[in-house]
Amino acid sequence: MTNIRKSHPLMKIINNSFIDLPTPSNISSWWNFGSLLGICLTLQITTGLFLAMHYTSDTATAFNSVTHICRDVNYGWILRYLHANGASMFFICLYLHVGRGLYYGSYMYTETWNIGVILLFTVMATAFMGYVLPWGQMSFWGATVITNLLSAIPYIGTDLVEWIWGGFSVDKATLTRFFAFHFLLPFIITAMVMVHLLFLHETGSNNPMGIPSNADMIPFHPYYTIKDILGLLAMITTLLTLVLFSPDMLGDPDNYTPANPLSTPPHIKPEWYFLFAYAILRSIPNKLGGVLALILSILILIIIPLLHTSKQRSMAFRPLSQCLYWLLVADLLTLTWIGGQPVEYPFVIIGQLASILYLSIIILLMPLTSLVENHLLKW
């Protein structure tokens, strides 16, 4: 008799995706982040669902409803902080996942990569709208500043902004629709994750050496289920330490002040995971130019496969490219720091130099270095 997991229509899909999936025998811990992202998404949807049961998306009561969740709802405080800090863990895992893809040439699976980039955009949009919901000062002004960027679009910009706002400023209509979209998008993300996995399982996973691994595959379970549990324990430990000891460490104190359209905070800035893009936006003194640079800073990932000029897929055996890669990582950390600083000397010039370096490394230096390395192979 055939095992039910191999014959039942639904069990068969699960079996082929998570149990008997042939996996390269040499993938490292950098391949853990896919499963961690799945767990983060599950955590966010679960905590978010329970928070939505007590939250009210009305400008008069939104701030108080969040306070009510933290003070009066049983374990509401832990739900709220798991959700807020869970978003930070989500982005840490996301950036490490993308970084792994860049380092080991996983972007050569173009369908999987492109859906991943769309997923990144969708998760960023979801996080931005979620940040508006507590209706604190930074929520309100963050929403005002970021949505107002669309007014830079020629001809239709102003109409577009007012259409998104649902009025002439960020108000009740804006908050209500942001809540609706913030609730809906995670389910769309879940569907997109399934498509992401569908395309990945068409080709199989890449590996650290960047060479075909068809000759040496092992089943996903028990080898990588056990390996992923280690990563999960590390992530859960970090998240719980953050939630239980310093839940507001990554937040902004201004968001504990109710939204006031008549008082602008001294420094308007987004959550830490958007600071690198915000720094690129601010480094260009022109509004439309800044918006284009902001979008390009993430959309540039789409063209990465076209910029691959190396004869080797992975960076494992390409020391010059490795140096550039870690320079890019340092540059992104610099941009993240600059994004949180006030707009004054010397931060402005550092931000501009870091932005130029970011685009130069990806568009110019990486492809040229790969060509040099191709010649070095002939020595």
Curated annotation (Swiss-Prot):
Transmembrane regions: 33-53, 77-98, 113-133, 178-198, 226-246, 288-308, 320-340, 347-367
InterPro entries with a match to the protein in the record: Cyt_b/b6_C, Cyt_b/b6_C_sf, Cyt_b/b6_N, Cytb/b6-like_sf, Cytochrome_b, Cytochrome_b_C_euk/bac, Cytochrome_b_N_euk/bac, Di-haem_cyt_TM
Binding site for a ubiquinone: 201
Cleaved signal peptide residues: none
Cystine connections: none
Binding site for heme b b562: 83, 182
Main localization, broad class: mitochondrion
One GO BP: mitochondrial electron transport, ubiquinol to cytochrome c
Keywords associated with the record: Electron transport, Heme, Iron, Membrane, Metal-binding, Mitochondrion, Mitochondrion inner membrane, Respiratory chain, Transmembrane, Transmembrane helix, Transport, Ubiquinone
Cellular component per GO, a single term: mitochondrial inner membrane
Binding site for heme b b566: 97, 196
PROSITE patterns: CYTB_CTER (PS51003), CYTB_NTER (PS51002)
Location in the cell: Mitochondrion inner membrane
Family: Belongs to the cytochrome b family.
Known partners and oligomeric status: The cytochrome bc1 complex contains 11 subunits: 3 respiratory subunits (MT-CYB, CYC1 and UQCRFS1), 2 core proteins (UQCRC1 and UQCRC2) and 6 low-molecular weight proteins (UQCRH/QCR6, UQCRB/QCR7, UQCRQ/QCR8, UQCR10/QCR9, UQCR11/QCR10 and a cleavage product of UQCRFS1). This cytochrome bc1 complex then forms a dimer.
Function comment: Component of the ubiquinol-cytochrome c reductase complex (complex III or cytochrome b-c1 complex) that is part of the mitochondrial respiratory chain. The b-c1 complex mediates electron transfer from ubiquinol to cytochrome c. Contributes to the generation of a proton gradient across the mitochondrial membrane that is then used for ATP synthesis.
Descriptive protein name: Cytochrome b
Gene: MT-CYB
